[in-house]
UniProtKB/Swiss-Prot annotation:
Gene name per UniProt: FAM114A1
Protein's cellular compartments: Cytoplasm
Modified residues (Phosphoserine): 120, 196, 202, 261
Record lineage: Eukaryota, Metazoa, Chordata, Craniata, Vertebrata
Coiled coil: 343-367
Polar residues biased stretches: 166-179
Protein name as catalogued: Protein NOXP20
Keywords: Coiled coil, Cytoplasm, Phosphoprotein
Similarity comment text for this entry: Belongs to the FAM114 family.
Organism: Homo sapiens
GO biological process: angiotensin-activated signaling pathway; connective tissue replacement; fibroblast activation; fibroblast migration; fibroblast proliferation; gene expression; heart valve morphogenesis; inflammatory response
Principal location: cytoplasm
Role of this protein: May play a role in neuronal cell development.
Length: 563
């Protein structure tokens, strides 16, 4: 009987549902909710027969249902949907179509409506489930990354053979990354219940996206901090292992820790170089032309002459800029004539250098030098230059006499050695060879030193002459005549230096006659080269006198122009 009554009631209820007017604004889900709400106000008798009927109805529809059966809830327990327009229309339709009076057929529709409510869950529940699932996935990923970083740390510590205290420090670094991940998961689980019950699709999607964004940010932070900690840990342990195994690394590390300024380093290097050079000079005096030329103050006088020449050149240019017309043309012609004298006499000096150099001697050079300075009308005495020339000629003559005596002794000893045994000859020959080598070194050293000294004194003399031409002339003399006298003076200096270099090479050849060419030829070539350099320095200093003579000519012309 109960089965037949249920079928009739179900068919009657379906008829009522079909007879109700269909409206576009009321969907099927809303009808189901309205029926359930209308029935929930009626008092339902709690008899065991009704519960059995419910279970039978649910089991009969198990093939078509997906979700588990949901028991009817009170109207107060249901939360209203967020979409206000839909709920108002739905309530209005419910009030118009369903009455709240108790009807005998209302129990069976309640079961069917509950079954329909289970069949179509609210759309917001799917988004909420997806949000919690995404958060749990990201949380598990961050936890996996954290555990991976700690595993990298442990493996690095094991490979670097860290034991004892170092292993304890690595264990202390692990909780930082391990504690950071559970915090993120707890935060994610705390956020889950608050955001899980959205009732509309838009709010659920927004909640899910915000939750995923927060989890991604926290996961990124944990990954970055964990990675940096792991790299720092590996780097420190690697440096410690290298320092323990390599003693040189400790030394370089201590040197790198020192902060030394560049000036201090340069000062220390300069002091060390000075000490090294001082030790070399005390032990053995080297035959370096540049160093010897600087010792005799030749370089300082050459630089001073260059400064004086540059100043004179600037004065000439400024004075020419202030003139115009005929005065400018006349002055230019005079200056060009002085320049032509310098250029013409330079070629004559090169042609007559060899012939005059062979004829002149030390005394003749000193006499000629004094006469030329007197013609310039300058109060300059070549005392230092004359002394240097005299010393050079004296030691050359002494060396030649010593060499001749040594050659005679060697010839006599050779005749005596022929009568003696071969055993007694070997040590004596070794001693004589040592004496000869010392003589060659002394001659070479004296040659280079004499050339450097004579050249330095010549440049010093030209510097003094330039100063006296500008400021200390006793009598006025035309610049063209002064230029001719200076050319003669410079030519005499160059010829004297050339003759000295040839005498030095001759003495070297005589002393090293029994030596091999590999030993003798470099010395002779060096002496000839330094002799050519000496003449070049003197000629360059002479060219620096041209602006000085031009300024002197301008000064004399200005004095004559004044009344």
């Amino acid at each position: 009987m109960s089965d037949d009554a249920g079928d009739t009631l179900a068919t009657g209820d379906k008829a009522e549902v079909t007879e109700m007017p269909n409206s576009d604004s009321l969907p099927e889900d809303a009808e189901v909710h309205c029926d359930s709400a209308a029935v929930s106000h009626e008092p339902t008798p709690a008899d065991p027969r009704g519960e059995g009927h419910e279970n039978a109805a649910v089991q009969g529809a198990g093939a078509a249902a997906i979700g588990p059966p949901v028991q009817p809830q009170d109207a107060n327990a249901l939360e209203p949907p967020l979409n206000g327009d839909v709920t108002e229309d739905t309530l209005a339709e419910c009030i118009d179509s369903v009455s709240l009076e108790a009807e005998p057929r209302s129990e069976i529709p309640l079961q069917e409506q509950n079954y329909l409510a289970v069949d179509s869950p609210p759309s917001g529940g799917g988004w909420a489930g997806w949000g919690s699932w995404g958060k749990s996935l990201l949380s598990s990923a961050s936890a996996t990354v954290g555990h991976g970083l700690t595993a990298v740390k442990e493996k690095a510590g094991a490979t670097l053979r860290i034991h004892g205290v170092n292993s304890g420090s690595s264990e202390g670094a692990q909780p930082n990354t391990e504690n950071g991940v559970p915090e993120i998961t707890d935060a994610a689980t705390d956020q889950g219940p608050a955001e899980s019950p959205p009732t509309s699709p838009s709010s659920a999607s927004r909640g899910m996206l915000s939750a995923i964004t927060n989890v991604v940010q926290n996961t990124g932070k944990s990954v970055l901090t964990g990675g940096l900690d792991a790299l720092e840990f590996i780097g420190k342990k690697t440096m410690n292992v290298l320092a323990e195994s390599d003693p040189g690394f400790k030394r370089t590390k201590t040197l790198m820790e020192r902060t030394v300024s560049l000036s201090q380093m340069l000062r220390e290097a300069k002091e060390k170089e000075k000490q090294r050079l001082a030790q070399q000079l005390t032990m053995e005096r080297t035959a370096h032309y540049g160093m010897l030329f600087d010792e005799y103050q030749g370089l300082s006088h050459l630089e001073a002459l260059e400064i004086l020449s540059n100043e004179s050149e600037s004065k000439v240019q400024s004075f020419l800029a202030s003139l115009d017309g005929e005065k400018l043309e006349l002055l230019k012609n005079d200056l060009i004539s002085i320049k032509d004298i310098f250029a013409a006499k330079e070629l004559e000096n090169e042609e007559n250098q060899e012939e005059q150099g062979l004829e002149e001697k030390g005394e003749e050079f000193a006499r000629m030098l004094t006469e030329l300075l007197f013609e310039l009308h300058v109060a300059a005495t070549p005392d230092k230059l004359n002394k240097a020339m005299k010393r050079a000629h004296d030691w050359v003559e002494e060396d030649q006499t010593v060499v001749s005596v040594d050659v005679a002794k060697v010839s006599e000893e050779e005749t005596k050695k022929e009568e003696k045994e071969e055993k007694s000859q070997d040590p004596q020959e070794d001693k004589k060879e040592e004496k000869k080598t010392k003589t060659i070194e002394e001659v070479y050293m004296s040659s280079i030193e004499s050339l450097a000294e004579v050249t330095a004194r010549c440049i010093e003399q030209l510097h003094k002459v330039a100063e006296l031409i500008l400021h200390g002339q006793e009598e006025e003399k035309p610049a063209q005549d002064q230029a001719k006298v200076l050319i003669k003076l410079t030519t005499a200096m160059c010829n004297e230096v050339a003759s000295l270099s040839k005498k030095f090479t001759n003495s070297l050849t005589t002393v090293g006659s029994n030596k091999k060419a590999e030993v003798l030829n470099p010395m002779i070539s060096s002496v000839l080269l330094e002799g050519c350099n000496s003449t070049t320095y003197i000629q360059d200093a002479f060219q620096l006198l041209l602006p000085v003579l031009q300024v002197s000519h301008i000064q004399t012309s200005c004095l004559k122009a004044q009344p």
